[in-house]
Amino acid sequence: KKTIEEDVEFVCELKFDGVSISLTYENGLFVKAVTRGDGTQGDDVTTNIKTIRNIPLRLKGDYPDFFEMRGEVIMPHSSFNSINAEREDLGLQPFANPRNAAAGTIKLQDSKEVAKRKLDQYCYFMMMDDDKMIFNTHYESLAAAKQWGFNVSNFMAICKNVEDIEDFINYWDEKRKELPFDIDGIVIKVNDFKQREILGFTAKSPRWAIAYKFKAEEAHTQLLSVDFQVGRHGTITPVAN
């Protein structure tokens, strides 16, 4: 087993509650967008992703010839509320939450409808071959990505120890209610790329990153009535009002 015989610096970031996406760029041009899917194969959603205004179709500055940018497609609260109000007016079932709405939207056949729903996207990880990586740290790579035109969250911090990490988590556990989009936790990553190489991966995930999930928000509600709907095959489903 390998160990890191030096101090470790971490980057703490918001864990966006949306749809994971991989963006491929060649010679500064956006060429493909694929959902995460089962981890090895996802859906090609390039045409729909092109409608998201904060995803650059052409990069600026000094960028690598070929790389992938991982990110999250989200639906802001303002868009979510507007879409659900419109669906209710049309007698359609409203979306349960912004994540489901974003997931359904990027798979629509009509790109014009996707554009009208005003999705956002945040980038959080740059992927390229190790021998072509031009940065020493994760934080440096995201700072460069922002210069090239990517939308990178400003809500991240370099943490030197456990106390710094706990402070970041506690702060955003309180402040998340004020954000214009949903988050469901904090992602903690080792900042230095060489240290990441030493730590490596398990069969399912990197050893240099971990997600802290917030507790689900709780609220009181009142049950007014229960309707019973009968399906085509005679299945009876209770529906609470």
Q: Predicted segment positions?
A:
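RNA/tRNA-interacting regions in translation and RNA-turnover enzymes
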Residues: 1-241
